[in-house]
A protein has these predicted regions:
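Periplasmic-side early beta-strands and strand-to-turn transitions of outer-membrane beta-barrels
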Residues: 1-4, 13-96
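Face-selective signature of the C-terminal outer-membrane beta-barrel domain
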Residues: 64-87, 106-220
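Flexible, solvent-exposed loop segments that connect beta-strands
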Residues: 34-50, 97-99, 160-163, 209-219
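Feature captures outer-membrane beta-barrel proteins of Gram-negative bacteria and organelles
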Residues: 3-13, 113-116, 219-220
């Protein structure tokens, strides 16, 4: 299931442009697997069957608003935006389909602010400036707390280890802020020659910690 809303509003007096965007995506992902090992109805014997995936749901949300101006004396285009995105993902398998999960999940939240600017004939005639700046706060959480071993029939047995890591329960956080700046200055000397200057800056962090796993060493 997917739904998107895009709109644009223009304030006539000032020329202010506002563009809201909302998007939602949901999928249960309960399609059938082919020829996988699973338990029979008694739970005592293994058979080869075609069971449905039972823990593979996906949900995402995006909300953004952009506001700015075009065709002004001081800018051909100038926009600022703010957005929020969220993803909830159930985890069904590991690196191989024989390793089945039934409770592990990964969730993320992300906030972003950005600005972009474009100007033709910037300072000099035939000089064009394009510049953008954005910063993102990204937080991801992997929940792996169940002492269970799952099978493709949806049943499980109690285990001594968690599902993904095979260790003690874990609620692993990843915080990765990201700043990106891009600047492009293009100057047309004549019909055959141009001078182009580009600058790119990228800075990211990697803050990791765990609420439950005492053996995990946090890092920044």
């Amino acid at each position: 299931h997917k739904a998107d809303l895009n709109a644009q509003f223009i304030e006539k007096k000032t020329g202010l442009i506002v563009r809201p965007t909302v998007g939602i995506n949901y999928s249960k992902n309960d399609y059938r697997m082919k020829n996988v090992q699973m338990r029979d109805e008694s739970g005592d014997n293994f058979i080869v069957g075609n069971p449905k995936r039972f823990h593979d749901g996906y949900f995402s949300l995006l909300a953004q608003v952009e506001a700015g101006f075009t065709n002004k004396t001081w800018a051909d285009a100038f926009f600022v935006s703010a957005s929020y995105s969220k993803t909830d993902k159930e985890l069904q398998t590991g690196s191989v389909q024989s390793k089945v999960y039934g409770m592990a999940e990964r969730n993320s939240d992300s906030w972003n602010i950005s600005a972009r600017y474009q100007k033709y004939n910037f300072i000099l005639k035939n000089m064009q400036l394009n510049a953008s700046l954005s910063h993102t706060w990204d937080h991801s959480l992997t929940v792996d707390t169940a002492y269970r071993k799952y099978y493709w029939d949806g049943g499980y047995i109690v285990s001594q280890r968690n599902e993904i890591m095979g260790k003690e329960p874990s609620m692993r956080h990843y915080k990765r802020p990201l700043t990106i700046m891009r600047t492009n200055l293009d100057y047309r000397l004549n019909a055959h020659h141009t001078l182009n200057l580009n600058y790119h800056l990228s800075r990211t962090g990697n803050d990791r910690y765990d609420d439950l796993d005492t053996s995990f060493e946090p890092s920044k």
